[in-house]
Amino acid sequence: MVHPLLFLQFFRKLLEPLHISEAGADAIAYTWLIIVCLLIVSLIATKALKAVPTGMQNFMEVVIGGIENMVEETMGEKGKPYFPLIATLALFVLVSNLIGLIPGFFPPTANLNTTAACAVIVFLSTHIVGIKKHGFHYLQHFMGPIWWLAPLMFFIEIIGHLSRPLSLSLRLFGNMNGHELVLMIFFALAPFLVPLPMMLMGVLVSFIQAFVFMLLAMIYIQGSLEEAH
């Protein structure tokens, strides 16, 4: 899906020497746009902190507080060090999903490259956290409780862990890309009132997919923190 926006044209020209497709360049452009927007919102919210929050500070405290509560409920106290990572991913995925509801914009999460990058971050973080917590004993997570089944369990666990980034990326990509295609069809058939319910459903889908991505990231990291049996 191509949109003749100036910043998209800029990124296409900028990335042309790398032979990146227009769809890939657009996804990169929207990704950077979202990053800049989140940074600006963060700066505005923290520019003049007050004991009694108002405006943007109040809004961001509600959002961040909600994510923090979910991290604590899912991972407990030991999940607090990983709250910044999980909150960053959750906000990025959510805003990436919602931006597609703005006419003329396309969600970067409807591009497989973006969702794969987010999934790889979760995958690497999971194992880095596990190795940092348990050292070489982290390998026991892949061996299972019965020593003579260790080779078979290791093979099965490796496949299971490698499938995680695949399922994370494909689930988010499939849902967001599918919604965009349905929305395009409805806009083509009836560009006025009919697409409105689909856009409202898009808000719900955006929140659900961001929540699922965040929840799975928490579960994977939580699993790497647990002692192997």
UniProtKB/Swiss-Prot annotation:
It is a multi-pass membrane protein. Keywords: ATP synthesis, Cell inner membrane, Cell membrane, CF(0), Hydrogen ion transport, Ion transport, Membrane, Transmembrane, Transmembrane helix, Transport. The keyword Transmembrane helix applies. It is found in: Cell inner membrane. The keyword Cell membrane applies. It comes from the Bacteria. GO terms for cellular component: plasma membrane; proton-transporting ATP synthase complex. F-type ATPases have 2 components, CF(1) - the catalytic core - and CF(0) - the membrane proton channel. CF(1) has five subunits: alpha(3), beta(3), gamma(1), delta(1), epsilon(1). CF(0) has three main subunits: a(1), b(2) and c(9-12). The alpha and beta chains form an alternating ring which encloses part of the gamma chain. CF(1) is attached to CF(0) by a central stalk formed by the gamma and epsilon chains, while a peripheral stalk is formed by the delta and b chains. HAMAP family: ATP_synth_a_bact. Belongs to the ATPase A chain family. This is ATP synthase subunit a. It comes from Geobacter sulfurreducens (strain ATCC 51573 / DSM 12127 / PCA). The lineage of its organism: Bacteria, Pseudomonadati, Thermodesulfobacteriota, Desulfuromonadia, Geobacterales. The gene is atpB.
